[in-house]
Amino acid sequence: MLMLTHTYLLQKVLGAADIKNQDLDIYIYNIAPDLLTIHPNINSDKTHNIKRFAEIPVKYPQSVYVMFHLLVDDLAHFGSICLDYQEAFNPESQGFCYIKGKPLIKSILDLHKIIQNEISYNEAAYRSHLIIEMIYDLVILKEINSLKTISLLVEAINFTFKNKLAEFTSTIGWLYDVQESDVQAVMKDACAYLTKERVERIMNIEGRIRLYSDKFGLKSKDNLFYEGIKKLFIQAKNSLELDEKELFLHQAAKTIKDYGWMPPIT
């Protein structure tokens, strides 16, 4: 899932547990597995390929919020919590995003034939799940706006950079074995890149098409190709809206609670 969905779910979980007055840096720990990939030398395999734990490390208690992110992604990608990261790609995964993305696969394959840039079934399956992730926070946008999630996330980034950077870099450095200078660079870039205006600019279908096209280098000027991608996103959005919109989030929160995850008491 994308960073806004992760942030919104954490807001809901903490609200349901009546946990208040937490410092805002917890939301940046929660998006760290995605945020760190801003750095050219850090990829999602590195940020997601760590052993899962529910216990709270005494010296690095905020790392439990990184784990919350990874547990949610496990359920979205694999359909269950994985004690160890699953390196082998499975296009038939029973994770929420892959199940929901499966009806898009054939259309993705056909679209790439239009620009004579054919891709494999496995690659199409991977891209289909990303479309689901990219559209999901648009499906729950009303709920996101009701909790002012965008403003919260932007405020949290700036708060962490100004007030909690040393602690954050130390924790992330321990968890991922990365240079603290790299973490500091990520946070500096995040403050410049993740502004309220920039985030709001991509909170629509067109913004998500740009994200998708940029990620995969799809620069085709073929209008039929563009309309095909747009149709995929609309199809995905309509499919998700047929369900109870937050069902996956409710189920994920319960599964993670049953697993034993809980925020540190401060």
Regions found by a protein language model. Give the residues of each.
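N-terminal leader/auxiliary helical segments
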Residues: 1-266
